[in-house]
Amino acid sequence: MKRWYVVHAYSGFEKSVAQALRDRISRIEIQDRFGDVLVPAEEVVEMRSGQKRRSEHKFFPGYVLIQIETYYEGGVPRIDNECWHLVKETPKVMGFIGGTADRPLPISSDEADAILRRVQDGAEKPRPKVLFEPGQMVRVIDGPFNDFDGLVEEVNYEKNRLRVAVLIFGRPTPVDLEFGQVQKS
């Protein structure tokens, strides 16, 4: 049975560590003892220079998840020495998280399912990088109401838009804006 283990990698090198693990696994031809290698992340959408940009936000910077064939020794989950050495000797890997240095423990099935669900949700619906709440003060930074301050009345994450009450001639006037047209005050 394959279980998920957490590997501590140098921060910023998670993707290269994941690729190195995949390469080493296929080179040694022990794919049957490994499953997925995953850098848990979600896609976020932000506005830069009036353009929507998609970027990736890692849930756990510095960590890589890997599925490894697990057997039980006295009721305790274990991985074989060859798998352990393959992971530990991968460049930019600092070790396993959980258990002891030479006897790592897998994360629970519930934790693994929650992480995988979160990754799936992030892939299906990219979320905005900046979150807004009704009642929050914002400053308009783009469009005809540039440099006006306003109060967020309504937020629509599906369309990446919000309704802001902007003071025009001393009266609050609702204006529909994109997330990229405002910044938090």
UniProtKB/Swiss-Prot annotation:
Residues of the KOW domain: 134-162
Alphabetical keyword list: Transcription, Transcription antitermination, Transcription regulation, Transcription termination
Entry-linked NCBIfam families: nusG
Stated role: Participates in transcription elongation, termination and antitermination.
CDD domains: KOW_NusG, NGN_Bact_1
Name of the protein in its database record: Transcription termination/antitermination protein NusG
Family the entry assigns: Belongs to the NusG family.
Stored Pfam families: KOW, NusG
GO cellular component, one term: cytosol
GO biological process terms on file: DNA-templated transcription termination; regulation of DNA-templated transcription elongation; transcription antitermination; transcription elongation-coupled chromatin remodeling
The keyword Mitochondrion is assigned to this record: no
